[in-house]
Regions:
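Beta->alpha loop/short-helix hinge microenvironment recognizer with preference
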Residues: 1-397
Length: 397
């Protein structure tokens, strides 16, 4: 069912003027996301005409854009992803671990998203794998599913990694399953200290290699010594790693993952109103507790669009990654070995999948089955290719 107010409504109303005033300062990925969201489930993308087999009622269903930043398209994507991951789940407790960048480092990431977000993944995963392998702690190889979120509840820039980690791993010799303590995976203070060291060491290496760029008020950080001075106080700060107690079972893990894997900066459900005053939406202020945490905010439409687009990821950037036992190269063999050590039956990944349920909602008049009776062509036209200028000295025909 369509929400009363959608991000698409705001984009369609204010998007053209917003793009015009910022021509040359909006990335191609951001422009593509805006266009996809504006045309999603409209005649522009085409669709089909459905008819009820019983009463003859007809309705039009338009196609989805399937853009990963579209608030309307994430439900189906999440269901498909979770179905593929179900075979990897083990009958053990799972922990939720969060790695967050300090505000000073988030500012660096703002203009270097692909490079710094990639470093965030690498430093956080290496931290977990290194300390888990230490015999003084777990002494095992663990599996990690990591998801990048770049936003706070008010759509501010707040990069952090959510990890789902089984409570244990395969011993370093591969001969037994090593379980973690029931409510304790790894020491978070040690995780925070190693994460800080790995991240800052490699961030400095990236700067030395010329892979970081700074503009405007931060342009002074292009200088090597100025950048090193900027990092000095950050090295002394405590970097917080948060770990939640384990889930009650694999089903709870899937339910929890579904809330994190395919989120976007703001869902349509959080939008309250859109008028000349701006866009009003619900958010959570995590500095408060209880009922005081739930608040509303009103932003000018231009600022709302700017904040939303801050979280459009660079083209081709993978926001869900797997490490350790769940890394793609050895995932199947590692999961099979873990199941063997845990003495649980293997899942048959080659078995024929269950017949998919009909994705079309039933007839709103009689509850009958709706079938496609006509395909509707898209009305959206791509921009014409640029006209080529003839070489100097030639006259265009």
């Amino acid at each position: 069912m369509r929400q009363a107010l959608e991000v698409a409504d705001i984009f369609r109303c204010h998007g053209p003027a917003w793009r015009a005033t910022r021509a040359g300062h909006v990335s191609l990925a951001q422009l593509k996301a805006m266009s996809a969201i504006e045309t999603c489930r409209t005649a522009a993308l085409g669709g089909h005409l459905e008819g009820c087999e019983d009463c003859g009622h007809r309705r039009i269903a338009y196609n989805s854009c399937r853009n990963r930043h579209c608030p309307k398209c994430q439900g189906a994507a999440a269901r498909e992803w979770l179905a593929a991951r179900e075979a990897d789940l083990l009958p053990v407790g799972y922990f939720h671990v969060v790695f967050t960048l300090p505000a000073e480092v988030a500012d660096i990431a703002f203009h270097n998203k692909a490079v710094v977000y990639d470093l965030l993944f690498k430093a956080a995963s290496e931290t977990m794998l290194t300390i888990a392998a230490d015999p003084r702690h777990l002494g095992a190889r663990i599996g990690i599913t990591a998801v990048l979120h770049t936003w706070g509840s008010a759509m501010t820039h707040h990069p952090h990694i959510h990890m789902i980690v089984p409570g244990g791993g395969i011993s370093l010799d591969g001969e037994r399953w090593v379980s973690s303590r029931p409510a304790f995976l790894l020491p978070v203070r040690l995780l925070g200290a190693l994460f800080r060291r790995l991240f800052l060491t490699r961030l400095l290496e990236l700067h030395t290699a010329g892979r970081l760029q700074f503009f405007g008020d931060q342009s002074g950080l292009n200088d090597q010594r100025a950048f090193a001075r900027h990092l000095a106080p950050i090295r002394k700060k405590k970097w917080v790693v948060f770990a939640k107690p384990p889930f009650s079972g694999p089903e709870a893990v899937l339910a929890y993952l579904s809330r994190y894997t395919h989120r976007v900066a703001i869902s349509n459900r959080r939008l309250i109103s859109f008028d000349e005053a701006g866009v009003t939406f619900r958010y959570k202020d995590y500095r408060c507790s209880g009922a005081d945490r739930h608040r509303t905010m009103t932003l000018h439409a231009d600022e709302f669009i700017r904040r939303f687009l801050v979280h459009v990821l660079p083209q081709g950037f993978h926001r869900i990654r797997h490490y350790g036992l769940l890394a793609s190269a050895g995932r199947k063999a590692n999961v099979a070995r873990a199941r063997e050590l845990l003495a649980v039956p293997m899942t048959d990944e080659t078995a024929a999948p269950d017949a998919p349920s009909d994705p079309r909602p039933p007839c709103p008049c009689c509850g009958g089955r709706m079938v496609v009776i006509e395909t509707l062509k898209p009305t959206f036209r791509a921009r014409a290719p640029p006209r080529l200028r003839p070489p100097a000295g030639m006259v265009a025909s």
